[in-house]
Amino acid sequence: MKHFLTLRDFSKEEILSLVNHASELKKEPKKLLQDKTLAMIFEKNSTRTRMAFELAITELGGKALFLSSNDLQLSRGEPVKDTARVIGAMVDFVMMRVNKHETLLEFARYSKAPVINALSELYHPTQVLGDLFTIKEWNKMQNGIAKVAFIGDSNNMCNSWLITAAILGFEISIAMPKNYKISPEIWEFAMKQALISGAKISLGYDKFEALKDKDVVITDTWVSMGEENEKERKIKEFEGFMIDEKAMSVANKDAILLHCLPAYRGYEVSEEIFEKHADVIFEEARNRLYVVKALLCFLDNQRGRE
């Protein structure tokens, strides 16, 4: 069964097809999933992700069932595989936002319904789909290639963007503090994909070098959910990595800024630059709705072929 746990399991053609279908559904909404049911399991808080999934299945003609970790017997020690067997047998899709990626993998092994990663500590693939759709809408793909800079932590967004750029043949430059490292296994996968796609990938510690000649600038919060106790240390380590006017002046003249939100002005991005690019950032957030619609339809079609 086809799940959506990471974009590394998807081909270039499948990824671009999802983006194109999202564009179609944004222009012309359709009830393509009449009476289908989506279970939404959250171990972490969510604003945009929950809204995108709940509205997506509803507007497609289906229903959403919200389940926090406190609602489930998982919180009392029930094995993930037992919960997966029950929920996966009752619904058509399962969306999960989890603390550990291994929880997703275990759930997917036993679920009869396709499982969607709505964020883990390793990957955030639905966000990158929304980013890709936004890049397309803002005409920042030339001949199918985008020039991207990612400035920030070696986190789930960095991993997902590295993998996606490698599969699609993009040019991506990543900049982060010297003591931050990308997983060797993820880096090796990206390098192998780049040999196939022709992607140009670079990793360094100078944000200005990464920003040169880029049309798309991506940043993310320095302190992810669950890292609140590390806030003081991380802010100190990321000093100098803020996206401000000076930083954006190094990118191409009409470059856009993307941020998955929530944004912390004065840290990863300045107030002035955030507001200057607010239109694209909040359209990026809205576009999550349409890529989720496309994703649900894709998984439903895949399941129907089995």
From Swiss-Prot:
GO CC terms: cytoplasm
Alphabetical list of InterPro entries matching this protein: Asp/Orn_carbamoyltranf_P-bd, Asp/Orn_carbamoylTrfase, Asp/Orn_carbamoylTrfase_sf, Asp_carbamoyltransf_Asp/Orn-bd, Orn/put_carbamltrans, OTCase_ArgI
An MF annotation (GO) of this entry: amino acid binding
Pathway as given in its UniProt record: Amino-acid biosynthesis; L-arginine biosynthesis; L-arginine from L-ornithine and carbamoyl phosphate: step 1/3
Known catalytic reactions: carbamoyl phosphate + L-ornithine = L-citrulline + phosphate + H(+)
Enzyme Commission code: 2.1.3.3
EC top class named in words: transferase
Cross-referenced PROSITE patterns: CARBAMOYLTRANSFERASE
Keyword Lipid metabolism: no
Superkingdom of source: Bacteria
Subcellular location: Cytoplasm
Subunit organization: Homohexamer; dimer of trimers.
Database matches in HAMAP family: OTCase
Protein name: Ornithine carbamoyltransferase, anabolic
Gene: argF
